[in-house]
């Protein structure tokens, strides 16, 4: 009986044990898979990448190339998250500047169609001017462009994936002014969203015609060029803990050893490093976020407890903040700006400053002194350019700033981002706001992935080693503008002067020979003179 009673339960226990082991292994596998998806899921997203060119100093913007019409005419367009229109100069414009490409020729495109309004009203509540639906756009700095609307085929060519093609209503410039007259890029690509009963924007049409993509786009810019990514963001670009490592040697951030070389578990370090900071958008159709503070050396320099509603704008070169906030930050930047390292009196005066002497005492005064001493020790000379903007020789010694978001998370804003490269110096890219509009511009975008999640109405930020695409690597095209230069303006003065001297001497010698010839003809006797006639 004992044997009979123990036999079956033993087999049942073994069976249950096997099932338990299988269940545990399955749960472990699912857990591992879940962790993998949480850290690597975004890398599985389908991403369409587009090269950006430009920089902050020379161009003051970043641009990409898009093909318009049939056959295609390439147009360079400034990437602008602060506006919604796609527009550029068209042939026949007499008030347009000289840009990278020839003005778009509607007659050369068999798919172009002007939006006329002679016999019917303009759609989207547009104005009818001289038989065409009017295009007009004003910008924060005061410039304005105007013309008429037309529609044509837009082809967006990805360097790593297939092209996306759709028909789009665009603006034809017939008048440009201010900055638009002198910019090198030909047009503007607005990246904000469509309003109800408004003209469908580029972003909405792109995702409508590429349903395989998530409705997320990312801007990742370095000192020279960068990328626009449609469909998500790229985890491979994210800065890993312990420093940053350039993407294919092209990044602009400080270079450090990789995670695997540091001896850490790459998966654990990745989870800690890959933390996208998300902030909800506060206005529909535009990319505004709430900023509650701006810290320098641990002290919030922002006076208002309400914070600021700031536009995340890739079309603005610099970050613009209220004047009182700017003055507080600038006071400490001025102290860190030592123009003459050999002036011992001036250097010692700065070193003897106490926290009590400041109108805004610093929470981390010791860090301020460390920064100042580091700048002095490394002889990080500073110069001032237009409007007193400080420029340092090196990045070393400059402080990190911290932007406080609505959830009180403090996001680091590093010197290699808020400073921009100008020749051999690094200049401050923060300015006083214009027209009471605070803006997070390109100096806030630089060296991070700025992720625009349209579906969830939020914007994400994460430090990144953004790829570099210098402008000289940009492919050439048949419709490039060929400047008809005055040849005399291209000749150096010495050669021009020499040509003038040679020309003058040639004219003078010609005159001399001409006069001599006249003299010879008038005063020299004819061969028959002085001789008697043959009959005589």
Curated annotation (Swiss-Prot):
Which residues lie toward the Lumenal compartment? 35-492
- The stretch of residues making up the signal peptide is 1-34
Q: How is it modified after translation?
A: It is not clear if the zymogen has a cleavable propeptide. Cleavage of the putative propeptide is dispensable for catalytic activity.
Q: Which GO terms describe its cellular component?
A: endoplasmic reticulum membrane
Catalytic residue list: 80, 313
Q: List the disulfide bonds.
A: 90-172, 93-96, 117-128, 122-133, 220-466, 337-382, 391-427
Question: Where is the protein situated, by its record's location annotation?
Answer: Endoplasmic reticulum membrane
Describe its function.
During the asexual blood stage, plays an essential role in the export of several proteins into the host erythrocytes by cleaving the pentameric localization motif RxLxE/Q/D (termed Plasmodium export element (PEXEL)) located downstream of the N-terminal secretory signal sequence. Specifically, cleaves after the leucine residue in the RxLxE/Q/D (or RxLxxE) motif of exported proteins including EMP1. Also, by regulating protein export, plays an essential role in gametocyte development and thus parasite transmission to the mosquito vector.
Q: Which family does it belong to?
A: Belongs to the peptidase A1 family.
Oligomeric state and interaction partners are given as: Component of a complex composed of SPC25 and PMV; the interaction is mediated via the transmembrane domains. The complex interacts with the SEC61 channel-forming translocon complex and is involved in the recognition and import of PEXEL motif-containing proteins into the ER for subsequent export.
Quoted from the entry, the domain comment is: The transmembrane domain is essential for localization to the endoplasmic reticulum.
Q: How is this protein named in the record?
A: Plasmepsin V
């Amino acid at each position: 009986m004992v044997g009979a009673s123990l036999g079956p339960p033993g087999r049942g226990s073994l069976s249950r044990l096997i099932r338990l082991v299988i269940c545990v292994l399955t749960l472990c596998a699912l857990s591992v898979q879940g962790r993998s998806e949480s850290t690597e899921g975004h890398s599985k997203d389908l991403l369409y990448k587009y090269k950006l060119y430009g920089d902050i100093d020379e161009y003051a913007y970043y641009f990409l190339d898009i093909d318009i019409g049939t056959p295609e005419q390439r147009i360079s367009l400034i990437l602008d998250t602060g506006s919604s229109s796609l527009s550029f100069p068209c042939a026949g414009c007499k008030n347009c500047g000289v840009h990278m490409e020839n003005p778009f020729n509607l007659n050369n495109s068999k798919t172009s169609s002007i939006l006329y309004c002679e016999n019917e009203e303009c759609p989207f509540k547009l104005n009818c001017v001289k038989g065409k639906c009017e295009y007009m756009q004003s910008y924060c700095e005061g410039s304005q462009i105007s013309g008429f609307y037309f529609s044509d085929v837009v082809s967006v060519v990805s360097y790593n994936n297939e092209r996306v093609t759709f028909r789009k209503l665009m603006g034809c410039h017939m008048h440009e002014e201010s900055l638009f007259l002198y910019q090198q890029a030909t047009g503007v690509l607005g990246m904000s969203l469509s309003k109800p009963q408004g003209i469908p924007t580029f972003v909405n049409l792109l995702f409508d015609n590429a349903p395989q993509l998530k409705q997320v786009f990312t801007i990742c810019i370095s000192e020279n060029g960068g990328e626009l990514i449609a469909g998500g963001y790229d985890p491979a670009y994210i800065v890993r803990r312990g420093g940053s490592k350039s993407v294919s040697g092209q990044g602009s951030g400080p270079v450090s050893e990789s995670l695997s070389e540091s001896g850490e578990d790459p998966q654990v370090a990745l989870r800690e490093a890959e933390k996208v900071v998300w902030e909800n958008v506060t206005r529909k159709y535009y990319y505004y976020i709430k900023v509650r503070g701006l810290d320098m050396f641990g002290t919030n320099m922002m006076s208002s407890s309400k914070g600021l509603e700031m536009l995340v704008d890739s079309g603005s070169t610099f970050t613009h903040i209220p004047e009182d906030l700017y003055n507080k930050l600038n006071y400490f930047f001025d102290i860190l700006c030592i123009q003459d390292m050999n002036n011992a009196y001036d250097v010692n005066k700065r070193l003897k400053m106490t926290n009590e002497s400041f109108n805004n005492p610093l929470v981390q005064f010791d860090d301020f002194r460390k920064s100042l001493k580091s700048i002095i020790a490394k002889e990080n000379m500073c110069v001032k350019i237009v409007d007193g903007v400080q420029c340092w020789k090196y990045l070393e010694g400059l402080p990190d700033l911290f932007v406080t978001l609505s959830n009180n998370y403090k996001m680091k804003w590093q010197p290699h981002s808020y400073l921009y490269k100008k020749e051999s110096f690094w200049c401050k890219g923060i300015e006083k706001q214009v027209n009471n509009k605070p803006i997070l511009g390109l100096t806030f975008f630089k060296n991070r992935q700025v992720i625009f999640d349209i579906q969830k109405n939020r914007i994400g930020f994460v430090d990144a080693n953004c790829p570099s695409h210098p402008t000289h690597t940009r492919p050439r095209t048949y419709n490039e503008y060929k400047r008809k230069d005055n040849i005399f303006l291209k000749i150096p003065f010495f050669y021009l002067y020499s040509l003038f001297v040679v020309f003058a001497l040639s004219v003078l010698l010609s005159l001399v020979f001409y006069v001599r010839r006249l003299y010879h003809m008038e005063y020299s006797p004819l061969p028959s003179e002085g001789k008697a006639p043959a009959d005589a």
